[in-house]
């Protein structure tokens, strides 16, 4: 599974577990819905770690716990994948 696919699925799973929409997740995380929507719809394959941290904070989850999921056991990096830290 590609890393961006695993991250997308994890976000869907978290929103489902919390019983909230992606729009509500963006609001509770303090990030623009357009940012989350663009990533989730595949228009963008990158999400900054800062944005991911805000998503975690919006659900009272530690960043390290986001990656403690079987989805991340066998991920593959995309070609030319960039990691942005802001």
Where are these regions (language model features)?
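The DNA-recognition helices of helix-turn-helix-type DNA-binding domains
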Residues: 32, 43, 70-74
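A short, Lys/Arg-rich alpha-helix, primarily the initiator
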Residues: 1-20
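The alpha-helix within a helix-turn-helix
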Residues: 15, 26, 56
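Residues within the helices of the helix-turn-helix
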Residues: 12, 23, 53
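Short alpha-helical DNA-recognition segment
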Residues: 19-38
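Short, basic-rich loop-to-helix N-cap that marks the start of a DNA-contacting helix
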Residues: 43-54
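Intrinsically disordered, low-complexity basic tails/linkers immediately adjacent to helix-turn-helix/homeobox/MYB/SANT
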Residues: 57-68
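Short, charged recognition helix plus adjacent turn
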Residues: 1, 38, 67-86
């Amino acid at each position: 599974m590609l890393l961006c696919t695993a991250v997308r699925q994890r976000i869907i799973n978290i929103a489902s577990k919390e019983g909230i929409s992606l729009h509500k997740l963006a609001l509770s995380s303090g990030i623009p819905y357009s940012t989350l929507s663009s990533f989730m719809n595949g228009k963008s394959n990158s999400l900054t770690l800062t944005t991911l941290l805000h998503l975690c904070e919006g659900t009272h989850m530690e960043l390290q716990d986001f990656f403690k999921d079987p989805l991340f056991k066998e991920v593959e990096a995309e070609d030319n994948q960039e990691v942005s830290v802001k």
